[in-house]
Amino acid sequence: MRKRALCFVLACSTAICIAQNESRFHSDLRREGEALKECGAISRVEDCGQTVFLGQPLHIAVGSLAPDNGVAVGLALVEHKNFANEWRTSFNVDAGATMNNSWRAGGYMKAFKLSGGNTYHVAPLFYLYSQSISLNRVDYFGLGQNTTPLNHTTFGFTENITGVNAAIPISVHGQAPIFAIVAEINGRFPSVRRGVEKNIPSIDSLFTESTAPGLNHQTAFVQPSEGLRLFPALFKDGIRLNYLLQFQQFFGPGDSVYSFRRFNADFDHEIPLSVLSKKYYNAGRAAVFPHNGPDGCTSTGGENKAIPCPQVSLTRKLEGSIHLRVFLSESFAGKGSSVPFYFSPTIGGSDLDGTHMLGSYPDYRFRGPDLLLFRGSVEHSLGKLPIGALFSVDEAKVGLRRGDISLDHFRHSFGAGLTVHAGGLPMISFLYTRGGNEGTHAIANISPALLGSSGRPPLF
């Protein structure tokens, strides 16, 4: 008996020592594995699905790539580390591919210090990333507002973006900050190749270097930027502003003819539709500067360590808001230089980053170095479901010169559809749009990042 008792004590002691020596990463893997074991029970189907698509440290990553390239499916690894000096870090690594052989892979790290003191009440935030993406279809109709569908061509595009950005919220007189200094420096390594679509000509069959600057030769770019973001809430939280003023510089090597500068002014206004919306809708809004990478939602908390993201649930009250946005982008190229066509913004359908602009037109329909957009949208939940109805109106134009951006001759588009905000899952949207003289367009999109997390570095 004594030997058995001694063996039992030794076994328990060994188990305790192993548990104590278990790393946090292995502990997270163990918890996720235990959660996945419950997938066999029908009553646990919802929890199983959230573990598969939101679980940490590993989950299946799903999200749309650029328009016409499909939905990428792959794996994501999410980790985090807390330091004794109040610094916090999160790490994301993911890779995914689509049915047309397009793909994206990247690593992302967020680092921030807990807020405190008189200098800041919201933590400074640093975002390091390296992302590569290969798209087998990007459409090109030419430059400017007056191109025709007859010049529809396609090309393949690959780009690596490696860099870091920073956001430093500033507090005045000890109050919660309403503005932040933002800056970044990126290395951009683009590459253009012939289109492979059977029914659409390749870009080099209709366009040349003079009509598509940068077609014959692509160079690496050093791309710093600096700016100011303002995010005050006015009239007792009746209007939430999110303004960005940003200067970007794209430097090619030596005296590259593709170097240019860009100014962006983005003015976004959010108006909750009711007092209840202010309480519940805004509580679920993404932070201005999220602490999570594109695959994580750890900071939102959760009792289940294997699924720290918000759980899918029914809305407690009717929720909704109005969004009004004005966006201006102007590019400046020196004498003898030009903006590469693949870095010019587009309107029509969705752009390379999946942003809807002038949805009734084909994707990438109008392209130019200068852009002006007016957008209004209303989104409201349907009953208590995590589904919302969306209505939108766009007025937009592109220009080849700054003088082309005037308040006339806009293209317009009207849209209606549904959105799905289900816990931490990527937002899903379905939009039917019409307007203009080129028919209608249906747009379906799955956000490339989990709801409430950080976006990925823009492709242009």
What are these regions (language model features)?
Residues L10-A19:
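Hydrophobic h-region of N-terminal signal peptides that target proteins for export
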Residues I18-L125, V182-E184, V192-I239, T355, ...:
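Outer-membrane beta-barrel initiation region
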Residues F25, R31, K37-S43, D204-P386, ...:
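C-terminal outer-membrane beta-barrel translocator/porin domains of Gram-negative envelope proteins
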Residues G63-L65, V93-A97, G116, L150-G156, ...:
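Outer-membrane beta-barrel proteins
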Residues S64-D68, E79-K81, A95-N101, A111-K113, ...:
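Transmembrane beta-strands of outer-membrane beta-barrel pores
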Residues L75, V93, G107-M109, T162-A166, ...:
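Membrane-embedded beta-strands of outer-membrane beta-barrel proteins
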Residues G96, I133-L143, T148-G163, R194-S202, ...:
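Extracellular/periplasm-exposed beta-strand and loop segments of Gram-negative cell-envelope proteins
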Residues L114-T162, R325-T346, I428-S447, F460:
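Outer-membrane beta-barrel translocator/channel fold
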